[in-house]
């Protein structure tokens, strides 16, 4: 962990897969499909002093290969949610942006597939996973901090 202001300024650089060249400097890396609260959780963790990055999980190719190495130091946590809840969140997001176009982003079958694929990737890499469906950002962050502390004992 580091000072809050330093962690907070770093978190903005490392959101949504930006600046993946220095992921090794992170304490925690969050992975998840779109709208699984990666960014707000990262910001919350940064305010607690944890250097946090997040990577959107589009498919297995969207993951930097070096983080799948067993000796990769940062704590990696997968975030998942129920497909139906994700469908509602994404639909509301598009409505708030005044976009009502139906796309794969809001196709329930595609979302179910996306969520299942993310779970398979998390299992394959033995990354701890948190279901954020009915959790607040604070509850999710508390679980992540516990995982981080266990990993770094």
Region roles according to the model:
Residues 53-55, 75-79, 128-130:
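Hydrophobic/aromatic beta-strand patches that form the interior of the parallel beta-sheet core
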Residues 20-24, 68-71:
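Solvent-exposed alpha-helices and their adjacent loops that cap or buttress functional pockets
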Residues 1-8, 12:
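Single conserved hydrophobic/aromatic residue that forms the stacking wall/gate
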Residues 14-15, 99-140:
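Small-molecule kinase domains that catalyze NTP-dependent phosphoryl transfer to phosphate-bearing small molecules
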Residues 52-63:
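Short beta-strand-centered segment that lines the nucleotide-binding/catalytic pocket of NTP-utilizing
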Residues 13-21:
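A short, basic/flexible loop-to-alpha-helix module at the beginning of a structural domain
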Residues 74-113:
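A glycine- and Lys/Arg-enriched "phosphate-lid" helix/loop adjacent to the NTP-binding pocket
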Residues 29-46:
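Glycine-rich phosphate-binding P-loop
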